[in-house]
């Protein structure tokens, strides 16, 4: 049983790393088409092997470390950041009953694990012995802490409506209506905060490409740089999956003629005259995984479209957006929504 769990984790992490790698290719191709150019198109068919070529190039390069820096911490920091980013996948449900760890406090687990990853950013900034990386890591940490407060407040509001911390229960409660419909403003704020939390454009204030400053990764090269890069794109994917689970019904379909996928799955089973129970279960899993993945791909492409469309915000505007606009608005909603639920005696709107 232990060996089977280890194999499941390894297979899941391999698929995650492959999806993260090809997200970089999708981003470069999308940005190319939006800027009226082709993008990567040499390595493989239409540039589909560009991710493998980039990975090999960066992994085979020499690791150059600043002489006066703490060499051990520079190597450990990206490993810490990537490992804690990957650990968040342990509680993500891809279909009914398909998750490495289905715990009752899975949402709290994701919040805690996601907060620990910021230590990698702090450590690499402090250990690089460079003012650029130190200042960038401090600014990045301040930004992450600020917008984690926004995300946590959003999630508390969702918990008030669902009365649970279990992600599978979140999905089951949305069989009748997705949470994005009653909480549309909170869903929009949540998505904006997700972009800021991952330090993506237009919130990438720690970077300055024209001055060759890449935030806390300025002094990194080769494999440490790759690990931080993987951590950034992994955070994009995991946050899109979490957004889908919280607001868009997770792996559930929500169309009258599909009826959460059961009618479509039954049609396929009857059409091909499938009687094997295990095979039917596999078909259901495939449909649910495709559904949640398709929803997440749409939100992930939203990150790319925002990057190509909007200019970078000034740092003071970024901070004011969090502390002056979003936070007072969410705190007022956090006070208002429990009162409304108490008045109508419906602290769990789905029961």
UniProtKB/Swiss-Prot annotation:
Entry's Gene Ontology molecular function annotations: NADH dehydrogenase (ubiquinone) activity
- Quote the EC number: 7.1.1.2
Q: Say where the protein is mainly found.
A: mitochondrion
As for membrane topology, the entry says:
Multi-pass membrane protein
Name the protein family. Answer: Belongs to the complex I subunit 1 family.
The record's section on Pfam families has:
NADHdh (PF00146)
Q: Which GO terms describe its biological process?
A: aerobic respiration
Q: Which domain of life is it from?
A: Eukaryota
Q: Which GO terms describe its cellular component?
A: mitochondrial inner membrane
User: Could you identify this protein by its name?
Assistant: NADH-ubiquinone oxidoreductase chain 1
Q: Which InterPro entries match?
A: NADH_UbQ_OxRdtase_su1/FPO, NADH_UbQ_OxRdtase_su1_CS
UniProt gene name: ND1
Q: Top-level EC class, please?
A: translocase
- Function of the protein: Core subunit of the mitochondrial membrane respiratory chain NADH dehydrogenase (Complex I) that is believed to belong to the minimal assembly required for catalysis. Complex I functions in the transfer of electrons from NADH to the respiratory chain. The immediate electron acceptor for the enzyme is believed to be ubiquinone.
Q: Which UniProt keywords apply?
A: Electron transport, Membrane, Mitochondrion, Mitochondrion inner membrane, NAD, Respiratory chain, Translocase, Transmembrane, Transmembrane helix, Transport, Ubiquinone
* Catalysed transformations (reactions): a ubiquinone + NADH + 5 H(+)(in) = a ubiquinol + NAD(+) + 4 H(+)(out)
Subcellular location field: Mitochondrion inner membrane
**For this UniProt entry, which segments traverse the membrane?**
1-21, 46-66, 72-92, 106-126, 141-161, 176-196, 238-258, 279-299, 324-344
């Amino acid at each position: 049983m232990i060996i089977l769990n280890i194999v499941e984790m390894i297979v899941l992490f391999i698929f995650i790393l492959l999806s993260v790698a090809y997200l970089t290719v999708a981003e470069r191709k999308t940005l190319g088409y939006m800027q009226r150019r082709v993008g990567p198109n040499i390595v493989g068919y239409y540039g589909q092997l560009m991710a493998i070529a980039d990975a090999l190039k960066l992994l085979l390069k020499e690791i150059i470390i600043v002489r006066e820096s703490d060499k051990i911490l520079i190597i450990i920091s990206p490993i810490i950041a990537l490992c804690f980013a990957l650990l968040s996948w342990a509680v993500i449900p891809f279909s009914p009953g398909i998750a490495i760890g289905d715990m009752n406090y899975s949402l709290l687990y994701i919040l805690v694990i996601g907060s620990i990853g910021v230590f990698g950013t702090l450590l690499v900034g402090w250990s690089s012995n460079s003012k650029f990386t130190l200042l960038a890591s401090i600014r990045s940490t301040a930004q992450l802490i600020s917008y984690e407060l926004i995300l946590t407040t959003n999630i508390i509001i969702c918990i008030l409506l669902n009365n649970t911390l279990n992600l599978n229960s979140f999905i089951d409660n949305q069989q009748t209506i997705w949470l994005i419909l009653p909480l549309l403003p909170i869903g929009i704020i949540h998505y904006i905060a997700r972009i800021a939390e991952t330090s993506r454009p237009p919130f990438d204030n720690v970077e300055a490409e024209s001055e060759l400053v890449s935030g806390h990764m300025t002094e990194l090269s080769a494999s440490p740089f790759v690990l931080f890069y993987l951590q950034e794109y992994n955070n994009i994917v995991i946050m899109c999956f979490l957004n889908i689970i919280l607001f868009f019904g997770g792996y559930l379909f929500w169309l009258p003629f599909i009826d959460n996928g059961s009618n479509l799955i039954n049609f396929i089973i009857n059409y091909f005259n499938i009687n094997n129970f295990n095979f039917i279960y596999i078909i259901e899993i495939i449909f649910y995984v495709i559904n949640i993945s398709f929803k997440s791909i749409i939100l992930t492409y939203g990150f790319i479209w925002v990057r190509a469309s909007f200019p970078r915000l000034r740092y003071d505007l970024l901070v004011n957006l969090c502390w002056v606009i979003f936070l007072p608005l969410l705190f007022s909603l956090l006070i208002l929504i429990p009162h409304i639920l108490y008045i109508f005696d419906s602290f769990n709107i789905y029961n």
